[in-house]
Each structure stands twice: as structure tokens, then as C-alpha cells.
Design a protein with these regions (language model features):
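Structural/interface elements that position substrates and couple domains in central-metabolism enzymes
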Residues: 2-456
Length: 456
């Protein structure tokens, strides 16, 4: 990797970079694009993005390396809510000549990419066990996009990544192929802004940020993004757009960490942290409410700040605030287990052999996603402590923890529990049965009406 995780002066870095040795024929556009756009990666971001673009009337090619994933999408087995499954079914039956829009084609054949006028790269960018970026999928996707790039195309990276990545994985390799970016081909970075399960802020209404290598790159990328965003906000460079995404999710991680700390302090003082935060939120300026919880999950908040920290370490720059916040956030599941032991002890019940149910294992309400969910670590730690653990989640049928597959309890209210951990409450969830449970550990801080309720 040219930057080796370092923050560099991107202007000097790229001004001295040699152009490719194989010139390509100048072309303003490809005359026979069969698709308006191709979306590379059909996961939690790529598939909704492809659907939004198709819904706007564009001809969309959806590309994923996994034939199994494509088969699941076609069969309606994909990790989508019911409404989105219906959108997929409708899109797949739309004929290219239909007046409602264009084609919606799913494939694992990357050789079709030259038929798309724009290519959106929407693949996961997780972290590894050392908290360093795992760029395996991103490198592969960008390499595929570059290998199949043709004059007149616009390539847009949307995956969260380090500052300088767009130039490293797209701009440089394209130049090595002989393209002149901004003339033959166009490159931009537009970080995804999708919040699964959020019906209030849907993708088509949320503004998008875009930074391009040249003004023409921005113009072309924005023309596409306007089809699936509320508006488009242009910044001066791809690096500014990359840093924007890191700032957004680091902001959330730091504030969640502070909310957790205030929750612990408030419990010690006998105060209700939810009441405190709600009261503070009446201030119309200088405040934004963040609520405490059992930890953070998904592939955004637990991961994205580590892309920045990794890059800073490469430049021998420290960020103690962010580092401390991420350490505290990561330690939250351990705190949950400690509180379980304490609450059970208050009832003279030993953790060993205790019957514990986790209510909700998805990382957030309204989704079936368990990636990086704190619930998984909580389950594993409870088992190590000797507890017998079950879970109940109306959106998640099974989870695998420590090599053991668990199945959701269908009727949790009909069984006897020593303690129930309320981890995730999906919209419309029935919690009336919790009033009959002897001990409830409410990690959502939202069930103040329960008699036998404890908080973290």
C-alpha cells in the first residue's frame, strides 16, 4: 500500500506519481452502455443502494462474487425486511422495456462491468483481530473495477476506508493502465449513508457527500447520486470525503462512550440517566442526545474509528480521546456480565447454572443483523461464567456463538428465567411478560416502568 497507513500530503504524493505506460484511446463516453450503473457488492449497503437506483428509473447491474448470495436474494432469503424483499421481487420482474424504468440484473460475472456507465463499489470494510483494517474485499472489488474499466466510465467508491484509499486503489491503478483520470475516466468517493431499520431517515432522503479527483469527476458522480439521495454536497477532494465519513462515525462512538460513562455515574448517584438525557435534550442548541447501551455493533461504529487510529499510528500520531472511547465501548459487554453477576447475587442466586435469557440479539432495533453485536460476546462470557443462556429475537432465527448454534425461543414469556437481559427491542416488541420475570437487566434504559428492573 503506497501510504502504509500514513497521513501524507496527497498533492505532493500524486504530483510525482508517473502516468501509465499504455495510453488509452480518448473517449468522452462509451456509446453502448447497457446499464446506467453497476453496484459491486450486494450486502447491507449495496443491495438497498441498487434497489434505490432502480426505483428511480435507472438500469441497474448488481454484481456480487458470491453465487450463493445472489441465489438468496433471488429466492427472498436475503437479510432484508419484508418490504425490501417485496422491492427485490418487483425489481427482478421488471422488464427492461417497462415504462416504470430499466433492467435490474443480478450477476457474479464481472465481465459485464464495461456495460455500465457508472460503477459503485459497496463492499464491507471490517477490522481484523488486531483492530487493523481488513481491506481484502475492498482491494478485490477495486481491482475488478479497474481491470474492467472502459473510457467514459465513472467509478465511485462508497465503502468506509482510510484517507487516501481512493487514490491508492482506484486512481493509481487506473493511471497504470494508461487512463487519465478526469479525461478518459472519472473517479470519486461518496461514503454510504444507510441506516438499516431507520424508517425516519431513508436513503433517498439523506444528503450524500461526494469528493472527486477533478470537478468533472464530482459532477458525474453527483449526477448518479441524485437518484438515490436527498441532495448532494460536494467537497474539495476525495480525501475530504473520506475523512468526513470517519469523522461522522467517530463522533458517534465518542459520544456513546460518554453516555455510557454518565449512565454508570448516574446509577451510583441513584439517578435515572434517561431522565437526565431527555432533560438535556430540551436545550435547542449545543446538544445532541446519545443514549447508553450494552455496546455497539454492526460494521460502522465498532470499526470505522479504528481505520483512523490505524492510519494515525502509521504516522506516529496519538489520539487519546478516540482511543479511550473505543476501549470503553469495547469493554461494555464485559460490564453487562458483571452486572448480571451482581443482580443475581442481590437475589441470592449464583451465576453458575442460572437460567438467563437475552431479549434481542440484533445489534440494533429493526434489523436482523448480528454483525459485531454485543449480544454475542455477552452470551459467550455468560457461558464461561457458568450460566445457561438462551435468546429470543423475532427477527433473528439462529446465531452461532463459540461454535454452538442457538435457536431463538419462540415464547419466552412461557418459560421460567432467573434473569432476562434486555439487549435489543425491535419496534412493536411485546415486553408485557417481563413484569413476571424476577430480575430484568435493562441495557436499553427504556423500561423504567418495570418493578424488578436493574440497569448497567
Amino acid at each position: 500500500m503506497p501510504t502504509n497507513g500514513r497521513i501524507v500530503d496527497m498533492r505532493a504524493h500524486h504530483a510525482n506519481r508517473p502516468h501509465g505506460r499504455m495510453p488509452v484511446q480518448r473517449a468522452a463516453a462509451h456509446a453502448s452502455f447497457a446499464y446506467d450503473t453497476a453496484v459491486v457488492g450486494l450486502g447491507y449497503v449495496g443491495l438497498p443502494t441498487a434497489l434505490a437506483l432502480h426505483d428511480s428509473g435507472l438500469r441497474v447491474l448488481g454484481l456480487d462474487v458470491s453465487d450463493a448470495r445472489i441465489a438468496d436474494i433471488r429466492a427472498g432469503r436475503a437479510d432484508l425486511l419484508a418490504a425490501d424483499r417485496q422491492r427485490v421481487a418487483s425489481a427482478l420482474t421488471t422488464d427492461a422495456a417497462d415504462e416504470s424504468g430499466g433492467a435490474f440484473v443480478l450477476t457474479s460475472d464481472a465481465s459485464l462491468l464495461p456495460e455500465a456507465e457508472t460503477v459503485l463499489v459497496c463492499v464491507p470494510t471490517p477490522i481484523d483481530e488486531h483492530l487493523a483494517p481488513d481491506l481484502t474485499a475492498l482491494r478485490a472489488a477495486c481491482r475488478t473495477a479497474v481491470e474492467h474499466a472502459v473510457p467514459g466510465q465513472t467509478l465511485v467508491l462508497t465503502s468506509t476506508t482510510y484517507v487516501g484509499c481512493t487514490r491508492d486503489l482506484l486512481v493509481g491503478p487506473l493511471r497504470d493502465r494508461g487512463f487519465e483520470v478526469g479525461v478518459d475516466i472519472f473517479v470519486a468517493f461518496a461514503p454510504e449513508r444507510i441506516d438499516p431499520g431507520n424508517d425516519r431517515h431513508v436513503q433517498q432522503q439523506v444528503p450524500r457527500v461526494v469528493g472527486g479527483v477533478t470537478p468533472e469527476c464530482v459532477k458525474r458522480a453527483a449526477a448518479l447520486l441524485e437518484h438515490c439521495a436527498g441532495s448532494v454536497h460536494a467537497v474539495s477532494s476525495v480525501e475530504a470525503a473520506e475523512m468526513t465519513k470517519l469523522y461522522e462515525n467517530t463522533f458517534r462512538a465518542v459520544n456513546i462512550s460518554m453516555a455510557n460513562e454518565f449512565a454508570d455515574i448516574s446509577r451510583g448517584l441513584g439517578l435515572d440517566i434517561t431522565e437526565v438525557i431527555t432533560a438535556a435534550a430540551t436545550k435547542p442548541y449545543g446538544f445532541m442526545p446519545f443514549f447508553p447501551g450494552p455496546g455497539v455493533g454492526g460494521h460502522c461504529i465498532p470499526c470505522d474509528p479504528h481505520y483512523l487510529l490505524w492510519q494515525l499510528r502509521g504516522d506516529r500520531v496519538s489520539s487519546p480521546l478516540i482511543e479511550t472511547a473505543m476501549t470503553l465501548v469495547a469493554g461494555r459487554p464485559t460490564k453487562v456480565v458483571q452486572r448480571v453477576v451482581e443482580v443475581l447475587a442481590e437475589r441470592e442466586t449464583c451465576i453458575v447454572g442460572a437460567r438467563v435469557l437475552i431479549r434481542g440479539v440484533a445489534y440494533k432495533p429493526g434489523v436482523a443483523d448480528v454483525r459485531e453485536s454485543p449480544a454475542l460476546e455477552i452470551i459467550e462470557r455468560l457461558r464461561r461464567a457458568g450460566a445457561r443462556v438462551w435468546f429470543a429475537d423475532e427477527l433473528v432465527d439462529t446465531v452461532r456463538v463459540g461454535g454452538v448454534e442457538m435457536t431463538s425461543v419462540a415464547e419466552p414469556g412461557s418459560m421460567d428465567w432467573d434473569l432476562v437481559i434486555v439487549h435489543t427491542l425491535h419496534p412493536g416488541a411485546d415486553v408485557s411478560w417481563l413484569s413476571n420475570v424476577p430480575a430484568v437487566l435493562d441495557t436499553t434504559y427504556r423500561l423504567g416502568e418495570l418493578t424488578h428492573r436493574s440497569v448497567l
